[in-house]
A protein has these predicted regions:
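Extended C-terminal regions of large enzymes
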Residues: 1-350
Length: 350
């Protein structure tokens, strides 16, 4: 089923999640220079197609279609070599390419791969640090697109310099230290690579998921951009609440089962796939689950997470995007996030 899904046709095994660079660029939601635009002129130099081609041409320790484990049939990763064929690190994921690439005005895949490796070695998140880097550029701490200055700053994280410590703490801290208004975080977590003004379903997820802004918590890109599991116009508000709600419930269950999220593409695309997943879990654990139980489980998990947040002082008032997403147009579609706070409050109505 995984091999036959529509997402498979986009060649995840050949381009990994970086296959999304061109797709999201075409949709006008590839966030550029701290959300100034949804389009990046140098996007092709950081695309999955380019990453695949460069890896093959350089050879050496580079690998295309590398699985996270021996039994993986998706093999949506790879190993990225330098110009001499020596390993830099794993293939950067789409989110990493975006945060250190378009978001920071950098179009050099080699240096993005080095940023990725530094984050892995230090133990910091590439989205949060990449968004923080873009904020530092917006604040004038270093120029947009200055790959060398950015690389030097990345090394300062492990060196423990004052600015390195600020960046290592992520975007929320960068915004506070520099007194910035346009800080793209929800509940302290950085917004990932899809601009909520042009992919409004994922904007609902960003605003409401208990964990803070996270695309994977309810990946509305499926129906908004990829046309997987149906189609909901990404530029309109209609249908986005229901889409995000359904996907957040499903994702909570998928996570609880320990399954790879890419397996959800098959569940969304193939009517019998969910039944197959439930049968698999029943056979493995001696259970008698039904497909209805999957929904109930997801709802229960989300309710528990929201209750935890409330006890920790994170109330429903935190279920919102930063104001600039509602106040500023996003080129090239010139759209805003226009789903009201009252509508967002209905996401968890069950």
């Amino acid at each position: 089923a995984l091999v036959d899904t529509s997402v498979r046709l986009r060649r995840l095994s050949d381009r990994a999640s970086a296959a999304l660079v061109k797709i999201v660029q075409e949709g006008g939601s590839l966030r550029t220079k701290n959300f100034a635009s949804g389009s990046f002129e140098g996007h092709e130099r950081g695309s999955g197609e380019t990453m695949n081609q460069v890896t093959k041409e350089r050879g050496g320790e580079g690998v295309v279609a590398h699985g996270c484990m021996s039994g993986c049939i998706m093999r949506c990763s790879g190993l990225y070599p330098d110009k001499n064929g020596k390993l830099i690190g794993k293939w950067p994921e789409y989110e990493t390419i975006w945060s250190f690439g378009p978001h920071s005005g950098i179009d050099d895949l080699d240096v993005i791969a080095r940023y990725d490796r530094i984050c892995d070695d230090v133990g910091v998140d590439t989205i949060d640090v990449g968004v923080g880097m873009g904020l530092l550029m917006a604040a004038g701490a270093l120029p947009y697109g200055d790959a060398d200055a950015a690389l030097k700053l990345m090394h300062e994280i492990s060196e423990g310099t004052p600015l390195g410590r600020v960046l290592g703490c992520g975007a929320e801290t960068v915004g506070r230290v520099y007194g910035m208004r346009r800080v793209p975080t929800v509940k302290g977590q950085s917004l990932p690579a899809y601009d909520p003004r042009a992919v409004k379903g994922v904007g609902v997820t960003y605003a409401t998921t208990p964990m803070g802004a996270d695309h994977t918590a309810g990946y509305a890109v499926t129906a908004n951009i990829l046309s997987v599991g149906g189609k909901v116009d990404p530029l309109k508000s209609d249908g986005q609440i229901a889409l995000s709600r359904t996907l957040q419930i499903a994702t909570a269950s998928v996570d609880a089962a320990g399954l790879c999220l890419f397996g959800a593409f098959a569940v969304l695309d193939i009517p019998d796939a969910l039944v197959a997943v439930v049968d698999m879990l029943n056979a493995k654990y001696g259970l008698t689950l039904t497909t209805d139980d999957v929904v109930t489980l997801g709802q229960s998990i989300l309710s528990t997470e929201r209750d935890f947040n409330r006890r920790a002082g994170i109330t429903d008032a935190a279920d919102r995007l930063p104001d600039f997403f509602s106040d500023e147009d996003l080129p090239p579609h010139n759209t805003r996030f226009d789903i009201s706070l009252e509508e967002l409050k209905t996401v968890f109505n069950w």
